[in-house]
A protein has these predicted regions:
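Solenoid-like repeat scaffolds
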Residues: 39-41
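Short, solvent-exposed secondary-structure capping/transition elements
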Residues: 43-45, 58-67
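Short amphipathic alpha-helical segments
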Residues: 44-54
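Short amphipathic alpha-helical segments enriched in leucine
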Residues: 37, 54-58
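Charged, low-complexity intrinsically disordered terminal regions and linker tails
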Residues: 1-35, 51, 63-137
Length: 137
């Protein structure tokens, strides 16, 4: 099973990421996290939106956003273990040049920011009809 292989690959010690490491984003994206989670309650947690945004970016074929990320979203340990493992595995598979957990998390954050940009554009263009479940189809 290809999916099982990706999960196994993501769990290798080589891709170990300390659970107390901070997941970061840009100030503009942090405001959008706050909007969707704290104000609109579209997502229950920022870490749920984080992994969702990674998947949105990967599915859209978006390039990683390398802007400086200086605001915390959450700790790695807060993120659902299975969702995080899938995101790690997919990003590691797409970026074979990455060979350590620190660089992998940096790239995951870059993909999350790309996904947030896609979601923000959709949100701004859809007024009150924003439905992130459309990305699951």
């Amino acid at each position: 099973c290809k999916q099982g292989g990706i999960l196994k690959m993501a769990e290798q010690e080589f891709f170990s990421i300390n659970p107390s490491t901070h997941i970061r984003t840009t100030s503009e994206n942090r405001r959008f996290y706050d909007l969707l989670v704290d104000e609109k309650n579209i997502f229950s947690t920022k870490y749920q939106l984080y992994t969702f945004a990674i998947m949105v970016a990967l599915r859209a074929g978006a390039a990683p956003d390398s802007a400086t990320k200086n605001l915390d979203i959450c700790l790695v340990g807060n993120v659902d273990k299975d969702n995080f493992a899938v995101a790690k595995g997919l990003v590691a598979h797409l970026c074979p040049e990455i060979n350590n957990g620190s660089d992998l998390l940096k790239r995951m954050n870059e993909y999350a920011d790309s996904g947030i940009a896609i979601l923000r554009t959709d949100y701004e263009n859809s007024d009150e009809d924003f439905d992130p479940s459309a990305y699951l189809e």
